[in-house]
Amino acid sequence: YAKINLANAIEELDLLEKKVESVIKTECDNARAYLENRIKNFFHEELINKLYRKIDPHPDFKSVRFKANFDSDHPRLDVFVENIKNENVLIPNLYFSTAQINILSLSIFLASALNSKEYDCIFIDDPIQSMDSVNVLSTIDLFRSIVVNEGKQIILSTHDENFHNLLMKKMPPNLFDSKFLELEAFGKLRAN
């Protein structure tokens, strides 16, 4: 009689274990889907891609994607770039140049700033580090577009005099509500 009770108890435990495993799997799948959706909304993936394409840092990889990775005990967020046909997927920090990584970072930052309803002013320190001249021009055009079309104010600081001069040419104070300041000496500014 004890063997039968033990066998029944084991069978009942097996059934309960399968039910619990099924519930846990369903809850994990729901949590994963929820987190993936929250990540997509938090990072404003569509806007990041729109901004990223405007600067155009890479000839093939035009799309950015964020993916939560739950495959290990320590979940993490992975960032990928994809080509137009979504055939090749890369982890940018392994294959991109410093300039391309900076452009990706700038796109992520600007998307977050543009989605802010509380702030109309964006502060950026030296946004063109390591960029070539084409990307610098595209970045200035993007800034100009943000100021004109999105109604945001952008305050830039840079040590690059060429970038400063290029900004003054592409966003002159007489056509835009722009102002350019230079640090003349310690604590002393000069307006252009």
Predicted feature descriptions by range:
Residues 1-85, 119-123, 138:
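Extended, charged coiled-coil "arm/hinge" scaffolds of SMC/Rad50-like chromosome-maintenance ATPases
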Residues 52, 104, 157:
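Conserved RecA-like P-loop NTPase ATPase core
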Residues 73, 113, 130-132, 162-165:
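Flexible loop/turn segments at secondary-structure boundaries
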Residues 83, 98-121:
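GG-anchored amphipathic helix commonly corresponding to the ABC/SMC/Rad50 NBD signature/C-loop
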Residues 89-94:
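Short pre-catalytic strand/loop immediately N-terminal to key active-site residues, enriched for Gly-Thr
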Residues 125, 129-136:
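ABC-family nucleotide-binding domains
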Residues 136-192:
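C-terminal lobe/lid and adjacent interdomain/linker elements of RecA-like ASCE P-loop ATPase modules
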